[in-house]
Amino acid sequence: MAVLIVVVAYPEVVFLGGSLSPAGLNPVVNATAHHRTVQVYPNTPSRDPKDGVQDLGARVWQLVPATKFVHRSMADEQSFSWNPYSAAGSLGPETLADLKLSPFVLLVALFGASATAFTFVALAFVALALYCLQQFFVRTLRLGRVAAVAGCLAFLFTGFGASGINSSVGAPYVLFPIVLYTLTEWRRTGGIPRLLAAIAAYAGFILTTFVPVQLLMLIFIHAIATTIDTANANDTDGSSIRRGLRSFAHQLVIPAVAIGLTAFAWLPVFDALRHAGSDVASYGERELASSGKLRMLKIASPWLSNSKKWVGYIGIAPVMLIAASWSRARPREKQILAVCAALGLSALALHAGIPLIRSIGNLPGLRSVRRDYWSAVSAAATTVSLAIAVSVIGRKGANALVATLGGVAIGFGILLAWLVNVVLGWNAVPVFGMLAALAVIAGAVLIVRASKHATRRHVLAIAAVALVAVELFSYQNHARLARVDLESHPPAYVTYLQRNIKTGRILNAGRGDLYPEWGSVFGIPQIETLNTMQVPPYRAFFQRYINPGEKSLFLQIGGRSRVTFKADPNALNVLSVRYLVIDQSLAPYNEAVAKQYSLAFDDAKAHVRVYRNTKAFPNAYLSPALTGTQKPEVWSELVTQTDDRKLLANAHAAGIPTTVAANSTQGSARIEDQTNTSVRIAVKAGKPSVLVLTDTEYHNWTASIDGKPVHIGRVNDVVRGIVVPRGESTVVFNYHSSARSVGEVISYATLGALALFALVTTRRRRARA
């Protein structure tokens, strides 16, 4: 059934080569490229493939590049603990938002990171989620298959589900049925296989590191699991609150073991947080904006607005059916409905930005959850509630009075909104949408009123599912881009850069070229990043010297079309920026760059120009002098600056001067080999010098000279420097996270303990049998 639902929902993907990969939806790499659209079901009205897609930038600029970077690393048998292509060197899995260690990214990377791999791995996860959801409704809650189908439709076609199944934001939502089912089945029946399944699902969920939605889903999962446990408890000792607390305590076994198994992933994150800067802190500075009344209408049904912008709608029929079934539900079902209503309505109010309610979302901690993330909870609550509602209708019917009064109230509200829209001339609420919404209301009322006849209830339950399917399915955007891999046919400027970049970097300005993180896709190092957990000194350097006019959460150039070139040329030299890649839509920026740098390549077809910086410092070079005097904007290859006392002491002991003599000789430094996490440099120094590597300095990097460890200092504000002796030597820089090593020990120990427990328990049970 799960596979059938997937095929019916996405025939253009399964049969016509449609893509669930977001590559091509945004004009990244080549803004002038045209991609074919495929479609089976009609859209009314016709829509662009990206209409209704939430947080498209996170998919195109974070998730897709992450899959391709991880694939490149796997293919080259390299670690992806460090990303040398982003922000002059940046953290790997600790960036969280791009999910590098998630099961989804790892599987996509394993299968080649193509649009086809992305698409079918996404479909596989959806099918698995739908299977677990069906089993949860049929086996755990015993609601029946018709009700299970209703829940699956709500899971897939409510606003958050429809938009989020192939995104980093929606990844925890896709996994929630798997975690919920395995957890509740283990609590219901026990057994080693179910225990291991629950732990594996929970561990995969932890590795899916889009934290805001992840935490919201965990709250929902444990709330539902605890409610089911409490309702199923055989003992009558103590209050329901005590039974709930005992149940929750028992559930904690699963996350405790899963946390131990995934320590290799989360322990480095906490280590990175200790050194994090303003980019992470800015998440706590968000505010939930107020929302117009028409947006609130669109949350019920997209029919009620002409806007194509995504909103986490839940539908009209689901709300009416859930409300009408409440009074006839079983006690356990009422408890679950009450929890779903409390969580779902609260989340929906925060998502809508309702006055007064939104002030709760602005409390410390909660304010880090963006408004659209709250709709994940309302979608999950609708999924569970609708399945219960359809099951109740099939068994006992529903409350006709509630349905009638609710239908009248909702219908009156829609009519009133439409009349206000007409009187004020807004043209925001379409007539067709208003009529369609009223038709759904009438259909729901008729189904509920007819359910008073016991002989018709099974058929009416099926009719209720059909009504929900028609309503929610009509909201979907059925247009898809054909599968495309942008790196398969790169534009001419990308090929030029790949041939000429060598050990240098690029500055990229604009969204139509190599907007971050797309440098990592093509193996072209860049100085920007669209990931968080940025190295604080680098973030400060970038915002002060590279792009002072466009400060935001991410380090980007061209987020605003009117941005101008204000980069300090010396700062670009420090970072070994050999080429400036400019999207020609940024006319003021391009004009200023053209005055200072010579044109190296003009890709008229892609509307991208590449300028050459002939004064860029080599990626590795010897500097004859080191000074503790900080002179911002006066960086030089001849005199390196630092505030690192140990490095200054080492330089003084080696006889390295603080100024440059007239006849100073520098020697040479040549990079012999470079991977994601190591750099080997052949050094020939005429006298003791400072070896500068123009990669971002971070505390997890170590260095050795001919196998002997040496101290690394941060020089020229952001890059690495060590003192090297006279003569020939081999310098090796290595990235090693001690936190990850400790985490790996914990993970292996947990795995061993779990295996031992499973083995001993299984043998004991066999002996008893």
Spans of model-derived segments:
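Active-site-proximal, structured, solvent-exposed surfaces of multi-pass membrane proteins
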Residues: 78, 82, 344, 528, ...
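Start-transfer (signal-anchor) and selected internal transmembrane alpha helices
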Residues: 1-15, 25-45, 246-250, 445-465, ...
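Extracytoplasmic
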Residues: 22-41, 466, 470-666, 680-682, ...
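Active-site lumenal/periplasmic loops and adjacent helix-entry segments of GT-C-fold
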Residues: 14-175, 209, 213, 297-306, ...
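Periplasmic/ER-lumenal interhelical loops and adjacent helix-loop junctions
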Residues: 28-53, 60, 65-74, 247-328, ...
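Selective detector of the "anchor" transmembrane alpha-helix that sits immediately C-terminal
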Residues: 110-136, 316-324, 740-765
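Contiguous transmembrane helix-bundle modules in multi-pass membrane proteins
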Residues: 150, 168, 174-175, 182, ...
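Membrane-interface helix-loop junctions at the exits of transmembrane helices
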Residues: 7-18, 74, 78, 95, ...
